[in-house]
Amino acid sequence: MRRTPVALTALALLAPLSACAGTAAAGDGATVTVTVGYQSRTINTVTAGTLLRSLGSFEKQLNALHDGHTYKVVWQDYATGAPITAQMTAGKTDIGSMGDFPLLINAARGKQLGRPTRLVSVTGYNLRGGLNTIVTAPGSPLSSLAGLKGRKVSTSIGSAADGTLVRALRRAGLDPDEDIHKLNQQPAVGASALVAGSADALSQFVAWPGLLAFQGKAKALYDGAQLDLPTFHGVTAREDFAKKRPAVLEAFLKAQAEATAYLNAHPVDAAEKVAKATGLPAEVVYLYNGAHGIATFDPALKPQLVSALKQDVSVLKDAKLTGDVDVDAFVDDRYARRALGAAYATSLAAVPPPAASEAWDRGAARTRAFATPKELLAYVAAHRSGVRAAYVPDATTGTLWFADRAVWVADGDALLPFVAPATAQAYLGAHPGARAVSYGQALEQAS
């Protein structure tokens, strides 16, 4: 199994609290309101949002405080991290979850407006950058980033997906400011623009690329993992809230650890829960959050993630979205260390193993894992009507993708999947005996 579950340790009840959180009134027996901003459809934040909420873990942890207060949790659902930051810097939201680039803007705005925030934990991450993907229309002639010159590309400026677009274009020798027409759009608007033909490509974060590919409305043009730079989502808290209500924040982080453990132990059920809450297809949720999904969930603030965050600052500065950001001052793992105890060190040391090919049979509570993509294809070929979804890892980046949406290459007896055509072409160029095959041909060869 791909995940490294976070062990939950028994912790003593914390001392009574004396100050109020968010909009709560102070005083013994008062009702304390804790406001949590989350992004239900940004499914790599589910352990601090959608899944956490559906499990009721935070409320249970608050009830266990027994500090004389009654707690009320207000959940606020947003499409992106920007409005969460706006609410936090206005003192109206206590805890929020968002991607790495929005987290930096959160840090910058908080300091600028005198409402400093702190990054306290991580939700979903991918050490190579596979959470972001550039897609184009299914019938598009585009097969590489070079073809984007002079074209319209939709993204959300200031998002991790925009960061991926900027870096990818620069590596391809294109100027992201001069060589493309960038459309600054919300994910749903950009998806509609791609389908309508008013955008030639879309660079977005999870779950939009996978959703559009699953629906047959897009095909991958660029796999963010080609950058080989970590991307992640995390939890941020207002500094004044954390200082006044440390036990409440630690209760949230304990609840996040519970949700993480549940996702790791019950990946299919967790995907179904998130699908029910968001309206996303469970097959898409599982692509990202499954047992061998694109994302890994460990709450610890790993050094390589913090290092990547520091590298992200220059991209936002170039876009004039922030000035310098003191990442070391923004990162604060004290609350997570106290909340998780010894399990924090386990989370910090966890290394995601390579992804594996998987088949999700209809009506099954578990998926089947296969040693090679060819073995998966042989199974699918023999059980076509019984397979709900099939997943394969990119042969070069390890990014999981839908088997029927992958670009396939036959190299001798091996059948190799790729997320994007450019990586497949690179492989073909380096292996003269290899040849491109369709999904149907790959199934036939495997069987």
Regions found by a protein language model. Give the residues of each.
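Intrinsically disordered, low-complexity linkers and terminal regions
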Residues: 9, 342-369, 373-447
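A bilobed periplasmic-binding-protein/Venus flytrap-type ligand-binding module shared by bacterial periplasmic
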Residues: 131-141, 231-247, 409-411
